[in-house]
């Protein structure tokens, strides 16, 4: 870890410079996590160093999972299913989107805490949109109240130990109209 103050611009890069040995010839960076500006600053403060982009290799390595990782991901999928069920149970006419999302997120958080009592509880969330709010993927949850015939977008994302799984479903409140069905069948 690097400790630095931010009282002067670029102190982070100065701190990195102090801990990188002078004879360092190469440093690996994940290029897709470094902005153009950040890369330029690394090159400026570590001008004798060559930077290698290891993002493709790192991504390939991350695709290989241990038995423990697979077990966490499977638990995440089960938790997402419970979140989806809680979401569906909360859906009713005149209920605001945020209440539906809160029900699903609370159910998932409680289930994670029950199954894994010593894990950090963070970054588990639900996106839930209704009606016109479903016109694009992953709009923020709003105070819009559900109406009969609404198309609904359910997205539950439990996060366990840095691994997230996703349950995404499209639903309707009541029966879809003939026009909605026609578009759905396209």
Task: Give the positions of each predicted feature.
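Active-site neighborhoods and metal-handling regions in enzymes and metal-associated proteins
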Residues: 1-186
